[in-house]
């Protein structure tokens, strides 16, 4: 019997250096959870680079729209929600990601 892979979301916006320093966290999560797909939520400027990481399976772009642009924000939340993540590692821990936490189905949410 083949086990279904868990989906885990990692949220990391921010500067290039911060994202590169997070690579060790990506590696650790990938090794601690067996049979897992790691998805990274980050800015569009880092998408192509992060897809080169052997630890990241998918990248979802979050261009951090203004809070009054609810249509785009909820479109992103819906995209995230359809992937049914079992865990979310929130490395950003911001007001924006707190908003995501409120509206997403209830995965296990881990913040820094």
What is the predicted function of each stretch?
Residues 1-112:
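Catalytic machinery of carbohydrate-active enzymes
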């Amino acid at each position: 019997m083949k086990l279904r892979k868990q989906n885990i979301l990692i949220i990391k916006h921010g500067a290039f250096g911060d994202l590169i320093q997070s690579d060790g966290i990506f590696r650790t999560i990938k090794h601690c959870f067996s049979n897992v797909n790691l998805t990274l939520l980050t800015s569009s400027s880092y998408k192509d680079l992060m897809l080169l990481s052997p630890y990241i399976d998918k990248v979802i772009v979050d261009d951090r729209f203004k809070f009054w642009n609810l249509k785009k924000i909820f479109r992103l939340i819906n995209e995230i929600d359809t992937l049914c993540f079992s865990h979310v590692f929130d490395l950003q821990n911001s007001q924006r990601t707190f908003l995501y936490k409120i509206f997403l189905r209830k995965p296990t949410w881990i913040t820094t």
